[in-house]
Structures are given as structure tokens and as C-alpha cells.
From Swiss-Prot:
Involved in the biosynthesis of the coenzyme F420 which requires phospholactate produced via the aldol cleavage of L-fuculose 1-phosphate and the NAD(+)-dependent oxidation of (S)-lactaldehyde. Catalyzes the reversible cleavage of L-fuculose 1-phosphate (Fuc1P) to yield dihydroxyacetone phosphate (DHAP) and S-lactaldehyde. The active site is at E68. The keyword Zinc applies. It comes from the Archaea. This is L-fuculose phosphate aldolase. Homotetramer. Binds 1 zinc ion per subunit.
């Protein structure tokens, strides 16, 4: 499988500071397999050799995947149309989530791309409760209390664009709140 776009998106997430350090994780589905980022490695320095592989039952074929593997698996198991998951700790979305503030979709692009946002209460990172609550959301753009966002797409580019637009929405909401 060609993972060039996967690596490109991971580096974009890092370069645009949607993730810092070794935070965040990304996966794509290819049939019964998922390709997922490893634990403890910065997305900005990811190579093809670093990418982990698991099957949809959670059997690890290669590498040591992110602690959020269960969240990715549950999403794929519950949503046949989803082939990519992006989880970031983007600054503005995370700040709004920590304050329990809902975001207004203020631009036409946000209405078209994000459509509607789901909000999930806080559950510990990597927990089965987090995985189950995220995977039960109907929406493809999800804000996690104190923990960033998850965006879903038919491919990795679509999931990435939702991340980018959702973080812009949070920035615009911040600006609007401070201009009042």
C-alpha cells in the first residue's frame, strides 16, 4: 500500500501545530487492515517504516500502535463508510472543550465541510469508554472534552480537511467572543 499521502498528512498536522510532541494519532483503513501511527513518536518525523498495522479485530500485525487503537477500531467497526481517522490536540478546539463551550459554524465552508459537531465527555486517553463514546457519534467531527478532536473521512484528505476547518472555526469563535 502506498502510504505517501498518509505521511504527508501526518507531517502537515505537525507543521501546522495541530499536534505537538508525540500527541495525536492517525489511521486509514484498507479492507480488513488499518494502518495507524505508533505510540510515542512525533507525527512530524513519521516514516513508512514507523507505521503500524492491525486488523479490524485488533490483532497487531506490525509495530506498537497508539494507545488510541481501540478508538480507531471501534470507529471502523461501526462506520463502514469511514476509511480515515485523524485525532489531534489542536489548541483552540481543545481550549473550547475544556471550557465546555460549543462552537458556532460561522462560515459557509464550515457548514459544508464540518456540517455538525458532536461533543464527547471526558474519558481517560486510550480507554474503552472513550472509544465507545466516540464511535457512537453520528457526526464526523467530534470534540473531546479536554482532549482535542477526532475527524472522520472517506479518505485521509477528507478527514484532514475537517480537522483544518474545525480548528479555523474555533479560532474564529475565539476572535468573535473577544470582539464583542
Amino acid at each position: 500500500m502506498d502510504l505517501t499521502e498518509f505521511i504527508k498528512i501526518c507531517r502537515l498536522l505537525y507543521d501546522r501545530k495541530y499536534v505537538v510532541g508525540s500527541g495525536g494519532n492517525v489511521s486509514i483503513r484498507d479492507g480488513n487492515l488499518i494502518y495507524i501511527t505508533p505510540t510515542g513518536l512525533s507525527l512530524g518525523f513519521l516514516t513508512k517504516e514507523d507505521i503500524c498495522i492491525a486488523d479490524l479485530n485488533g490483532n497487531i500485525i506490525k509495530g506498537k500502535p497508539t494507545s488510541e487503537l481501540n478508538m480507531h477500531l471501534k470507529i471502523y467497526q461501526n462506520k463502514d463508510s469511514i476509511n480515515a481517522v485523524v485525532h489531534t490536540h489542536s489548541m483552540y478546539c481543545t481550549a473550547f472543550s475544556a471550557l465546555d463551550k460549543k462552537l458556532k459554524l460561522v462560515t459557509p465552508e464550515a457548514e459544508m465541510v464540518v456540517k455538525k459537531i458532536a461533543y464527547v465527555d471526558y474519558f481517560p486517553c486510550g480507554s474503552l469508554e472513550l472509544a465507545e463514546n466516540v464511535s457512537e457519534c453520528i457526526e464526523d467531527s467530534i470534540i473531546l472534552k479536554n482532549h482535542g478532536i477526532v475527524t472522520l473521512g472517506k479518505d485521509i484528505t477528507e478527514a484532514y480537511i475537517k480537522t483544518e476547518v474545525l480548528e479555523e472555526v474555533a479560532q474564529l469563535n475565539y476572535i468573535m467572543n473577544n470582539l464583542k
